[in-house]
């Protein structure tokens, strides 16, 4: 009887503890924040090159500007932090467009240098899965990938 009682208590405690640990969190990306030197220069780049729409900076802090990335996601440009940021190509903003070829023509017209992943100038990279991609940099040196996943 004692063994059965202990077994039921152990099972009940295990179920109770598992129920406590079963809380999961479903996250979604809300925004990407970039530390920039000149918020107005960066804002002009993102609105002109990527044609992002500016939205109200709800933080109401000077030196910060917000843009719509799409699907409820935002880009926040922040110039109030003056620390240096180390940037390399592995840290990049990846964007997809159904109009990939038209976008490549657009940045070519705007004379914005782009490359494939290895760094060959004016070259479109084609991944093993057939997705086209290019990489270019914003005024602060952040890498941006635009790819054809949405096609």
Where are the regions a protein language model picked out?
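Bacterial Sec-dependent N-terminal signal peptides
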Residues: 1-24
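N-terminal beta-strand motif that seeds the catalytic metal site of vicinal oxygen chelate
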Residues: 20-40, 91-95
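Short glycine-enriched loop/turn motifs at secondary-structure junctions
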Residues: 26-28, 85-90, 127-128
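Generic short beta-strand
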Residues: 32, 65, 133-136
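Core segments of cupin and vicinal oxygen chelate
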Residues: 34-74
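Vicinal oxygen chelate
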Residues: 38-40, 93-140, 151
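Mid-chain, structured segments of secreted extracytoplasmic proteins
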Residues: 64-109
């Amino acid at each position: 009887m004692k063994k059965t009682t202990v077994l039921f208590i152990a099972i009940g405690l295990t179920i109770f503890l598992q129920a406590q640990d079963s809380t999961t969190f479903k996250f979604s990306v809300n925004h990407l924040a970039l530390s920039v030197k000149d918020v107005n220069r960066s804002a002009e780049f993102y609105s002109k090159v990527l044609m992002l729409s500016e939205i109200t900076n709800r933080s109401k802090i000077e030196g910060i500007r917000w843009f719509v990335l799409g699907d409820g996601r935002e880009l926040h440009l922040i110039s109030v932090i003056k620390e240096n940021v180390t940037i390399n190509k592995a840290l990049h903003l990846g964007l997809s467009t159904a109009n990939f070829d038209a976008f490549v023509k657009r940045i070519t017209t705007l004379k914005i240098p782009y490359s494939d992943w290895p760094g060959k100038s004016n070259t479109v990279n084609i991944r093993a899965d057939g997705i086209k991609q290019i990489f270019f940099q914003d005024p602060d040196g952040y890498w941006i990938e635009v790819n054809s996943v949405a096609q």
